[in-house]
């Protein structure tokens, strides 16, 4: 992402950041780049020349109540408009325009209002789904919110397939109601492994995953809002952050994000140590 362009004296004046209507890898990613762009422009002294707009298909900015108030405050403090219930329908790159639909419900009536926004810089989050082979193999959900995108139909606690008891699924492709992040996968791996071994031995899978996920939302260069939560959308804070008020952005969480998580992933998780 060329943030140096967003904060430069070049022809970038209107920047648009979008979030989509499907589950996707790291739900906080569109928020991070938006806030980092704003802070970078301030650091370069060009913030007064830049208009940022955030568009999301969701009905709220963030669906974890413990962290939402502060996140809303940050957007308001930085004068970044939040546009809810809006879907991207197309992008005209030659005209530098995004075609949106505003979706509203009045009673039982669904009202769809199309509109167009001009941009100089666009950060677009596309809709995401499971690979076609998952859908074609009949492994995905066939009903409910996760069916349209064919995420694998597993029990949210044991991670065992609802129909095929010899299949265990985890990570981005698993159809479970939590965020698709490496932090979530880190907690899912031992659950999935132990339950798979139990199945291979003809035993019942007893290990249970509580939906833990973490989304370190980078709010500026030096601070992170460390969102850790479970299936109930309640805080599930790890040590040592359990001794700190994590409803606010933290410098210590920035250190974790920048200097610890990457080596933990590549040297620890990928080698089975973390």
Predicted feature residues:
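Internal hydrophobic alpha-helix adjacent to the cofactor/substrate pocket in enzyme cavities
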Residues: 39, 185-211
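Residues at the starts of beta-strands that form the adenosine-phosphate
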Residues: 14, 49-53, 166
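Single conserved hydrophobic/aromatic residue that forms the stacking wall/gate
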Residues: 1-12
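Short hydrophobic beta-strand segments
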Residues: 13-24, 54
């Amino acid at each position: 992402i060329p943030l140096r362009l967003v904060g430069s004296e070049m022809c970038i004046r209107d920047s648009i950041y979008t979030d989509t209507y499907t589950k996707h890898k790291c739900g906080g990613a569109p928020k991070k780049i938006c806030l980092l762009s704003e802070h970078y422009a301030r650091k370069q002294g060009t913030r007064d020349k830049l208009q940022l707009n955030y568009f999301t298909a969701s009905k709220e900015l963030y669906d974890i109540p413990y962290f939402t108030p502060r996140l809303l405050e940050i957007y308001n403090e930085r004068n970044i408009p939040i546009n809810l219930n809006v879907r991207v329908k197309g992008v005209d790159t030659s005209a530098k325009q995004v075609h949106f639909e505003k979706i509203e419900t009045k009673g039982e009536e669904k009202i769809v209002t199309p509109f167009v926004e001009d941009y100089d810089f666009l950060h677009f989050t596309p809709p995401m789904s499971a690979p076609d082979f998952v859908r074609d193999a009949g492994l995905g959900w066939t009903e409910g919110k996760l069916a349209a995108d064919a995420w694998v139909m597993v029990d949210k606690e044991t991670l065992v397939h609802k129909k095929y008891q010899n299949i265990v699924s985890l990570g981005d492709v698993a159809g479970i109601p939590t965020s698709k992040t490496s932090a979530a996968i880190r907690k899912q791996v031992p659950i999935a492994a132990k339950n798979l071994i139990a199945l291979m031995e003809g035993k019942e899978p007893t290990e249970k995953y509580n939906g833990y996920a973490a989304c370190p939302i980078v709010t500026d260069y030096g601070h992170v809002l460390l969102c850790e939560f479970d299936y109930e959308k309640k805080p599930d804070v790890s040590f040592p952050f359990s001794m700190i008020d994590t409803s606010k952005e933290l410098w210590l969480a920035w250190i974790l994000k920048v200097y610890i998580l990457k080596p933990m992933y590549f040297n620890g998780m990928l080698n089975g140590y973390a």
